[in-house]
Amino acid sequence: KREPVMNPIFSRTLKALCTVTVATLLSACGGASSTVDPFVATRVIAFGDGFNYVDGAGAGLSTVQTGETDNTIAGRIAARYGIVVKNVQTNALAATGGFSYATADAKVSNVVTQIDDFLTSANGTVAKKDLIIIAVGNWEIKAAVASTTPTADMDAATTNLVTAIQRLTAAGAEHVVVMPAINMARTPWAATSPNSKSLADIQQLSITTSSLPGLNSFNFLLLTKLNAAYRQDKKPVYLLDRSSDFNNFAGKFDTNGTTRIINVSGLALTADTGLYVPVCTAHTAMAGCALGGLDTTSPLTATSYQSYVFADDMNLTPLANRLLADRMIYTMQTFGWAP
């Protein structure tokens, strides 16, 4: 099987991460050993937003559109099993293979519809060898920033998502991986102070940290509710929160609203430059871009996407998507869900 490829520019960061908690998980107690008969999926079903949004051939769309089939979260994880995840609209759902229902800017309500569409379709029966990958939360937070009731919105969204996931497990799903929001306070979008919100405000809608609690954040509420829904030792659902990994390469944030960015080339702290710059010309559209749509204005070049983090004001480059997916694969291996 193909080993996940880690870009060398992140090697020192990843070595450090290996000594820290690798994921914010539902408890892994009772999980299978990664060395004894690990789970090998024969079908991968993806739901969610741009992290899992692909074309009919399986190439990522909400990123720099390189035409590669492993440049999304779902695509990279599926490649571990030798599977290519393709858009289900142009590839009819079958008993084996890879299929994505994800759309570019999906919120939880859209993911609920995606799951409904899957469960009510021909071949929508869940099988033991199915791996289900859900990525959602970024667009939920973007909407909450513009809302007058963000706390209620986060509460309702996470409840509805857990209910939809329970429909999958009630139908027989035994391997469901959920990737929640990244820390949206560290995106170029957040730097524009949307709706006059500070970086601290936006972070507290995304995640919770010891220094800046976000007890009504999307990720914290989702973790709490999934833990309540799945109390048994051997759980069919794991929440793989990549906030720690993302925070390590997307900058250092503190409560006074100052953002410092880690420069990839030297891993040194710099101002809001370097990898923080989105590489797509139409970056405010938050829709990724084709190679012909890359910004080559200095300091950017036609190959900057190979070392930068952001494709646009929210979506990540293939490099960053692969990094997060590789960390998810590593964690999945520890409890026997990946070879």
Describe these PLM feature segments.
Residues 1-5:
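Short, Lys/Arg-enriched N-terminal segments with co-localized hydrophobic residues
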Residues 7-18:
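Bacterial N-terminal signal peptides that target proteins for export
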Residues 29-339:
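Conserved active-site regions of diverse hydrolases
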